């Protein structure tokens, strides 16, 4: 029973790290990356649809994204969705393809993005700690029901703390890498 709780906690902590990494990937750096546009929703035939379902997003060069729209009638909607996103991008239409030059980030904008990334990292750490708290409370319930001993609980707490520290360290490493990436000019 305790092993199942331990495995579940480890799995959930891993998912927290992955979610944090995905959130940080959406923060714009100086380089073009297709995941920048993942959060954009396009009004396609009256339905909000993710951009990657109505167009193919690629990298033309280090500062330019290209968006190839599958349905020519949706070009205007895709262009409007990209312009109205909070990414500060200005697409240029070239037939069925939109070219999106990424403007260089100002020092002030970089610092704002670093604040956002740090907040995401803190959110990830909090989520990992919540998983630890939940797992420990589950084992303490087992102890109250006399299904495990006090020593088992202590050992479990130590193990879960080690997992927690390891996963928080991963989040910190991801944060450090993202900060370095953001500060590159």
Curated annotation (Swiss-Prot):
<protein>
    <recommendedName>
        <fullName>Ribosome-recycling factor</fullName>
    </recommendedName>
</protein>
<comment type="similarity">
    <text>Belongs to the RRF family.</text>
</comment>
<comment type="function">
    <text>Responsible for the release of ribosomes from messenger RNA at the termination of protein biosynthesis. May increase the efficiency of translation by recycling ribosomes from one round of translation to another.</text>
</comment>
<keyword id="KW-0963">Cytoplasm</keyword>
<dbReference type="Pfam" id="PF01765">
    <property type="entry name" value="RRF"/>
</dbReference>
<dbReference type="GO" id="GO:0005829">
    <property type="term" value="C:cytosol"/>
</dbReference>
<keyword id="KW-0648">Protein biosynthesis</keyword>
<dbReference type="GO" id="GO:0002184">
    <property type="term" value="P:cytoplasmic translational termination"/>
</dbReference>
<dbReference type="InterPro" id="IPR023584">
    <property type="entry name" value="Ribosome_recyc_fac_dom"/>
</dbReference>
<dbReference type="InterPro" id="IPR036191">
    <property type="entry name" value="RRF_sf"/>
</dbReference>
<dbReference type="InterPro" id="IPR002661">
    <property type="entry name" value="Ribosome_recyc_fac"/>
</dbReference>
<dbReference type="GO" id="GO:0043023">
    <property type="term" value="F:ribosomal large subunit binding"/>
</dbReference>
């Amino acid at each position: 029973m305790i092993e199942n709780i331990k495995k579940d906690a480890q799995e959930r902590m891993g998912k927290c790290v992955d979610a944090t990494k995905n959130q940080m990937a959406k923060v714009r750096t100086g380089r073009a990356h297709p995941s920048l546009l993942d959060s954009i929703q396009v009004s396609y035939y009256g339905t909000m649809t993710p951009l990657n379902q109505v167009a193919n997003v690629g990298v033309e060069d280090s500062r330019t994204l290209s968006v190839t729209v599958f349905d020519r009638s949706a070009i205007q909607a895709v262009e409007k969705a990209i312009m109205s996103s909070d990414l500060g991008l200005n697409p240029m239409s070239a037939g069925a393809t939109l070219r999106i030059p990424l403007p260089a980030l100002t020092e002030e904008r970089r610092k704002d993005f670093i604040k956002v990334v740090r907040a995401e990292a803190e959110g990830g750490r909090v989520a990992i700690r919540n998983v630890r708290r939940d797992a420990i409370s589950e084992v303490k319930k087992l102890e109250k029901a006399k299904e495990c001993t006090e020593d088992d609980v202590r050992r479990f707490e130590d193990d879960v703390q080690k997992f927690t520290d390891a996963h928080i360290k991963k989040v910190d490493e991801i944060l450090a890498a993202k900060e370095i990436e953001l500060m590159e000019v």
